[in-house]
Amino acid sequence: MSVQRYFIYLAYDGTHYHGWQIQPNGISIQECLMKALATFLRKDTEVIGAGRTDAGVHASLMVAHFDYEGEPLDVDKVAEKLNRLLPQDISVYKVCRVKPDAHARFDATARTYKYYITTVKFPFNRQYRYRIHNPLDFQKMNEAALTLFHYSDFTSFSKLHTDVKTNICKIMHAEWTQEDEYTWVFTIQADRFLRNMVRAIVGTLLEVGRGKLSVDDFRKIIEQQNRCKAGTSAPGNALFLVNVEYPQEIFE
């Protein structure tokens, strides 16, 4: 019997999880998905995600893959069954078959994140927004964001002491836009992201918006390739992974 590979498209509210990756000291999205698959397929099944979201970070679209040996699966039935087995804060959109060597992480050509900030206290979105108390200069923040396109080494925005072999990333989009009277969104797209990178960039851009750093200071922080020079990471609760893109040829 042949081994087939499948992609799972899912969303989750990361509030009560210790991130995507399995952790020894807390429940993770990956663990929940593997348990649900093991129950449905009646055997332990490894799941590989397109990336590793940190504790408290959400995804409106994450992609993961798993392998199955046997008769081809009914993908609609798999999605339906997983949704019954998974907690209320994890949802599967669809399952699709891909080529045997397709990889959720290594074949992704682009990933997009959004970070939400708000200027008002509102009880119903507090776990998905970062509340800002002082005025921000979004024009300056966007000027600083534009400088990201001129660099590829983002060591200054990377979590220290990780197992990552390279800090090189290609940023394709980075911009603050106003969603409504009280909400601003930072959208960033790159071929790959480092651990904690988006939150570190947002935290440093907020320092520009507050007038504590100039656009030139922001540029110098990137050039220094030193995490200690950048701003404090923004909280994870306002960050969403919103898209992962793949070349069409990996799908069957």
Curated annotation (Swiss-Prot):
Annotated coiled-coil segments of the chain: none
Q: Which residues bind substrate?
A: 113
* Reaction it catalyzes: uridine(38/39/40) in tRNA = pseudouridine(38/39/40) in tRNA
> Which key words tag this protein in UniProt?
Isomerase, tRNA processing
Q: Relate the protein's function as given in its record.
A: Formation of pseudouridine at positions 38, 39 and 40 in the anticodon stem and loop of transfer RNAs.
What's the protein here called? tRNA pseudouridine synthase A
Q: Which biological processes are named by the entry's GO terms? A: tRNA pseudouridine synthesis
Which InterPro entries does the protein's record reference?
A: PsdUridine_synth_cat_dom_sf, PsdUridine_synth_TruA, PsdUridine_synth_TruA_a/b_dom, PsdUridine_synth_TruA_C, TruA/RsuA/RluB/E/F_N
What species was this sequence derived from?
Bacteroides fragilis (strain ATCC 25285 / DSM 2151 / CCUG 4856 / JCM 11019 / LMG 10263 / NCTC 9343 / Onslow / VPI 2553 / EN-2)
User: Which CDD domains did the record assign?
Assistant: PseudoU_synth_EcTruA (cd02570)
Query: What's the EC number here?
Result: 5.4.99.12
Give the family this protein belongs to, as stated in its UniProt record. Belongs to the tRNA pseudouridine synthase TruA family.
GO terms of molecular function: RNA binding; tRNA pseudouridine(38-40) synthase activity
Assembly, per entry: Homodimer.
Q: What NCBIfam families does this protein's entry cite? A: hisT_truA
Q: Where is the active site?
A: 54 (nucleophile)
Claim: Isomerase is one of the keywords in the record = yes
